[in-house]
């Protein structure tokens, strides 16, 4: 998140979503507790996935912001699918409180996915403008 200083709106939204993600983990732990399950497997899986995602996010390259936006888009949609599956399971086993908690998380993920989707183009264009302004070739093209 700290490397997103050139994209303040993105940085702010990622910081907000980090807070949401912490709440989502707390909700998941509550759901597992309600169902008498251990959270260790869930935590291991979540930490593994987040580690892989984090590695993708931290791979430095000139176009990392574009790659990160695409990875965010993919990951948010993966989380949406996961929550929908968990909600279906809760409906089947009759755990309405768990379903309510998971729906809250699903809504947050859908909102984040929508935000990312709406910002892929503006972030891409901002990146291109920054590259054009910073490179000699880009400045020459802008002067024409």
How would you describe each model-predicted region?
Residues 1-144:
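Amphipathic alpha-helical hairpins
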């Amino acid at each position: 998140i700290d490397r997103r200083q050139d994209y303040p709106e993105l940085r702010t939204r990622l910081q907000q979503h980090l807070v949401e993600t912490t709440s989502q983990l707390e909700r998941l732990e509550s759901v597992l507790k309600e169902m008498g399950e251990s959270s260790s497997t869930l935590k291991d899986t979540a930490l593994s996935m987040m580690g892989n995602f984090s590695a993708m996010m931290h791979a430095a390259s000139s176009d990392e912001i574009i790659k990160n936006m695409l990875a965010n888009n993919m990951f948010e949609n993966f989380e949406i699918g996961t929550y929908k599956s968990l909600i279906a399971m809760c409906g089947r086993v009759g755990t309405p409180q768990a379903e309510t908690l998971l729906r809250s998380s699903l809504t947050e993920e859908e909102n984040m996915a929508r935000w990312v989707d709406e910002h892929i183009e503006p972030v891409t264009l901002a990146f291109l403008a920054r590259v054009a302004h910073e490179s000699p070739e880009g400045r020459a093209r802008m002067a024409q």
